[in-house]
Structure formats: C-alpha cells, structure tokens
Amino acid sequence: MSAKIIAFPRPRQPPAAPAPTLWSVFEERAARNPRKRAVRDADGSMTYAELLNLSAQLGRAFLREAERQPRRRRIGMLGQNSAVHLATLLGCARAGLAMVPINWRLAEEEWCWQARDAAMCAVVEGFGHRMPEDFMAADEISAIGQSTIRMLPREPVTEAERGSPGDTVVIGYTSGTTGRPKGACLSQAAMLANARHSQALFEITADDRVLTMLPMFHLGGLNIQTVPALLAGAEIILHQKFDAEAFFDALTRHRPTLTLLVPAVMQALVEHRRWATADLSSLRAAGAGSSVVPLALIEAFQSRGVPIQQVYGSTETAPIAIAQSREEAWAAPGSIGRPVGDCEARLGPGGEIQLRGPSIMTGYLDDPAATAESLVEGWYRTGDIGSVDAEGRWWFTDRLKHMIISGGENISPAEVERVLAQAPGVLECAVIGRPDTKWGEVPLAVVVAGPGFDERKVLAFFEGRLARFKQPRAVAVVPALPRTALGKVNLPALRAMVAAPP
C-alpha cells in the first residue's frame, strides 16, 4: 500500500509594505495632528492640514506643466524662505518631479543658465524675486507666482501619488572647482535617510520648534533641520533671511528649541548689542557647519549653555554625513563628530574624506564624467582632508579642492576666473581666498596687467555677471603668475606672493 502524500497549501505571506516616499511620510504625519501649526513665515502660519493641501495642489499644477513640456520635468524654486518653498518640495515629491532650488543671491544670468541646464518647465517665484520675463517667454518656462498660488483650488486632491523612493526629488547646484556649478541629484530615499539621521542627531520630536534663518536654497538650510523636523511633526519658524534683531526677537516670542548657524552668523550674533542679555535658555542645541567654526565662537555659545553640534557634509550627501552628538559637542569642541546612522566614512589617498551611504547623491545631472570622478565604487570623494583620533572622532583639516568659502557660500575660483579673464587690461589671472574677519574668506583677484588695465574697471566688470558674494573685493597685480612644472598656477606660491609686503 503506497503512502498518500497530502499537500497543504503554503500560508499566504502578507504583502510587503511599500517603501516610504517623502510624500507618504509627510502625509502620515499630517494625518496624526492636522490642526497643529506646521510653519510660521512672513505671511502668517499654516497647519499641517493646510500645508498638505497646498503641497498636493502645487503637485497637480506641476504635473500639468511637465505634461505640457515632456522633456522638461524640473520645477525651479526662486524666493526667500517661506512655507511655499516647503510646499514646492512636497508637491514635487507627490508628483514624481524634482525641485531645483535657485540661489536668489546669484546674478540673473546665472539664474537663466541654471534654468536651462536643469530643463525647468516652471519656476515658483516669491518674496521679491522674479525670473527675467523675456527669458521665460523665449524658453517657454511658466512662472508660478504668489497670485497663482492664492488662486489654487482648496478641495482635496484625489489623484494618486506618482512619486517613488528612487525618484530624484531635489537637484542641488553646487559650486565645482572646474567652473560651472553641477546639479547633484538626490532621491526621495536619500532625503528620507538624511531625515532619519537628523532626527536622531538632534533628538527631534513633535514638541520641537525649529528656527530656520539660513537660506533653503542650500541643502543645509533645507535639510539639516528643517525638512527632518517637519517630517517629525515639529513647528518650523521660517525667517526670510538672517537678521540678528529678528533672531533675538524670535528667542523671546517663539522660544525655539533648535536652530542652525554658520560662522558668519555666529559672529554677527556674538557682536550684537543684545547678545549679553539675550535669553538663550530655550535652545537645546544649535547645529553649525559650512566651514571651519572658530573655537572662540563655539565657546561663546557653549558658555551660555548652548552646545554647538558641528555637522559635516555637502550638497552631494543630502547633506549630513559626519556630525557631533550633543555630548560630543561638549566633550570635543572643534571635532566634526562621527559618521551618522547608516553613513560610512574612510580616509582615502592623501587623507581625503570619502563617504558612502543611503543619503549620497545618485550623480551629477547630465554629467557622467564628473559623476565617475566623484563617485568611485559607491564612495563619494569629498575633496576634503581629515583625520580620526584615538577616540574615533573625525576632524576636518584642509581642502584638497581649490574652493573659497565666504559666509557659508561656496565660491568656485574657476567660475570667477572665467569672468575675470574677459575684463579689459587683464592678460593672465587667478582667484584665491583672502582671510576676512567677518566672512572667513573673500575672493581676491590676482592679475598680470596689460594695456588699459584699471582696477576700478576690473571690479566693476563683475556687476551683473556674477553674484555679489562671488565678486572679488580687491585686485593684486603681479608681474607673472607662479607655475608648477606642469604649467598649472602654483597656489601656495601665489598666496605667499600676495601676502608678502611690497
């Protein structure tokens, strides 16, 4: 008698939950407490439900623009900090499109170049900044201004979300050492990974009030604290731009628990007449970064009970990669901390800091050569030199790349040199950073003068061609530029030459 085999059906496995998107995380957060205030800005305040609806309406409007021009699926954002900036990001996430923040400090010519390079189909404009109308008309790019936004429908959007975790949701332009800025492509998954890192680092909860004064056209202002706090259900206090008086007023009026600073802002606050009597007790901590933070500034804040948590990263890392916990801010001021969350860090040749993890960019927009140079087997080459101490803390020591950092803004010398070379009376030129007590560094033009050279005319030549913060403050004339055996400008020798007394 043969045995009878009875086959039992396998129990059905529940379907795996879909991977979260930027929109799904925000939508879930808004559903928990729809009436809670999400954002304060110059126009008033907005609840989570109101921000959710505005974001969805903008997302639908963006899709219409993208369908009108299928080859252009990017949305520019030009304007000072506002709730609309956050709604633009969230609307793009819902629609499966990418937001491109535009630095309003740049010259109009630079705005237009970026709009073309990113293939924008529309630009959201606000708070006194507008793209040139003739350019927008010629390139068939739609302008979405405040009046258009006010006229958006108020009923809920019923269309399904189109975004997915792998979609590029932000293209952040970053100054490169070779001249033109490059667009770093960040996916929704990268933005969410950064949010997790930030929430753990700063211990962000729904009870927090985060003061954002730094511009959100930079990934630092947008994504070190602001978006992570929004996804945690906190309240965001947006200032259009940094103003020391407004900062001290906000301490009294809104009692923020967290904020983000750069050295130039810290210096301005410490030197302000209200610093000595200001009540900083509501601040649990402040993040700081963008360039080396002087120990004297760290001490000025920490002596008032506010730990300065240094953050290291770049646009390409969304941006947090290495950072200090609150405990380490007290224990090792000046260190940049340890790799955050799922991020890995190592020292490459020459002590270069190299990073790998879920928040790293997918690459540079339409630039495979630059991508291949910066991303090697998944490791992002930062171009910065660092070290690791016996306790495992990381320290920033120098830059491999020739970059000027002025008031928290990255300035590519090659970009400035391209304009300088066209100025009348300039035979040869180079641009280097000169130490400055207020800004950290400012650009200095070094030229070999020819017929018709006039320093005032050279400095005036930059007006309208480059943003004010990129323009050299002075010109140093040298008989010849020192060069290496390969013919490249010898930067250490050039710095020594212009620093030496005449």
Question: What residue ranges belong to the model's regions?
Answer:
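Conserved AMP-binding/adenylate-forming
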Residues: 44-45, 61-109, 410
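Conserved pre-ATP/AMP-binding loop-to-beta segment of ANL
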Residues: 19-22, 34, 143, 154-173, ...
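ANL superfamily AMP-binding
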Residues: 35-36, 49-76, 106-108, 112, ...
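Gly/Ser/Thr-rich phosphate-binding loop
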Residues: 256-261, 270-330, 344
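AMP-dependent adenylate-forming
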Residues: 24-47, 65
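Conserved AMP-binding/adenylation subdomain of ANL enzymes
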Residues: 192-209, 217-258, 271-274
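AMP-binding/adenylate-forming catalytic core of the ANL superfamily
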Residues: 60, 85, 347-349, 357, ...
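Structural core segment of the AMP-binding/adenylate-forming
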Residues: 64-65, 90, 94-154, 158-161, ...
